[in-house]
């Protein structure tokens, strides 16, 4: 059914106030490990699993990880492709993203042009996403030729998010970069104040406290990835972040 994953995401946000998604990078895991991670994070309450991130990922690698995840859990699998080669016909949907503050047109429209026919051929549900890199940005800013937007200029980040809405994107994503500093709550709050789009925040989120503050500030979706690669007890770690995310959204609703 067209729009099934989008409707699922929006319904989960309505139900919980804010939700959590787990990012699994095929380059940093094996299908067997990915399946175990997926099962544990799903049991902990994550609402969807994103697959992707790195640029050196082939379709075969993505296929193997996606299929392993889908055999182990029923939560939706959404592709988060670092390049057009990282698409899989077996996923439930794809974040069809444009890096809005890239200085290289390839990451704004070029890769999207290359990937669009593949997405259509595979029949993937498309989730149009305006992707904005802020703060240090980490490796993703280097790879995508992006000048990250400084934390000290939240109004510029908000303007990009508003532009994403006016350009027709259905979601907006604030990326702090893997392993870097998380996006500050003040930026999240300002962005949420100018756009009606569901707001995704990821990068550098390593604790329930940070997840709670970001959800309280306006994040509708919290994404974590590195933390599951490092955690010795994935179910407990993600469970705490899921609960904190929902608590933050509840506090926001009471303000």
Curated annotation (Swiss-Prot):
Mg(2+) binds at residues 25, 54. GO terms for molecular function: magnesium ion binding; phosphoglycerol geranylgeranyltransferase activity. It catalyses: sn-glycerol 1-phosphate + (2E,6E,10E)-geranylgeranyl diphosphate = sn-3-O-(geranylgeranyl)glycerol 1-phosphate + diphosphate. One of its GO terms (cellular component) is cytoplasm. Pfam families: PcrB (PF01884). It is an enzyme of class 2 (transferase). Its EC number is 2.5.1.41. Sn-glycerol 1-phosphate binds at residues 173-179, 203-204, 225-226. InterPro entries: GGGP/HepGP_synthase_I, GGGP/HepGP_synthase_sf, GGGP_HepGP_synthase, GGGP_synth. Transmembrane segments: none annotated. Its cofactor is Mg(2+). Pathway: Membrane lipid metabolism; glycerophospholipid metabolism. One of its GO terms (biological process) is glycerophospholipid biosynthetic process. HAMAP family: GGGP_HepGP_synthase (MF_00112). Prenyltransferase that catalyzes the transfer of the geranylgeranyl moiety of geranylgeranyl diphosphate (GGPP) to the C3 hydroxyl of sn-glycerol-1-phosphate (G1P). This reaction is the first ether-bond-formation step in the biosynthesis of archaeal membrane lipids. Belongs to the GGGP/HepGP synthase family. Group II subfamily. NCBIfam families: GGGP (TIGR01769), GGGP-family (TIGR01768), PRK04169.1-2 (NF003198). PANTHER family: HEPTAPRENYLGLYCERYL PHOSPHATE SYNTHASE, PTHR40029. This is Geranylgeranylglyceryl phosphate synthase.
């Amino acid at each position: 059914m067209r729009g099934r994953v989008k409707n699922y995401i929006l319904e989960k946000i309505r139900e919980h106030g804010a939700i959590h998604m787990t990012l699994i990078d095929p380059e940093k895991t094996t299908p067997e490990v990915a399946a175990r991670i997926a099962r544990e994070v799903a049991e902990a309450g994550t609402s969807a699993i994103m697959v992707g991130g790195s640029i050196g990922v082939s379709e075969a690698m993505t296929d193997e990880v996606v299929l392993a995840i889908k055999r182990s859990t029923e939560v939706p699998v959404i592709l988060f492709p670092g390049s057009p080669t990282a698409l899989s016909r077996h996923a439930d949907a794809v974040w069809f993203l444009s890096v809005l503050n890239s200085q290289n047109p390839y990451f704004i429209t070029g890769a999207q042009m290359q990937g669009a026919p593949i997405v259509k051929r595979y029949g993937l549900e498309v989730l149009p996403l305006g992707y904005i890199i802020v703060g240090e940005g980490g490796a993703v800013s280097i790879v995508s030729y992006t000048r990250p937007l400084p934390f000290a200029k939240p109004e510029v980040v908000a303007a990009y998010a508003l532009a994403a809405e006016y350009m027709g994107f259905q979601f907006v994503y604030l990326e702090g970069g893997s392993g870097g500093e998380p996006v500050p709550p003040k930026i999240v709050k300002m962005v949420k104040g100018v756009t009606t789009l569901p707001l995704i925040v990821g990068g550098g989120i390593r604790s329930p406290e940070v997840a709670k503050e970001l959800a309280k500030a306006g994040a509708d979706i919290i994404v974590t990835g590195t933390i599951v690669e490092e955690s010795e007890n994935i179910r407990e770690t993600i469970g705490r972040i899921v609960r904190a995310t929902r608590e933050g959204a509840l506090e926001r609703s009471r303000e």
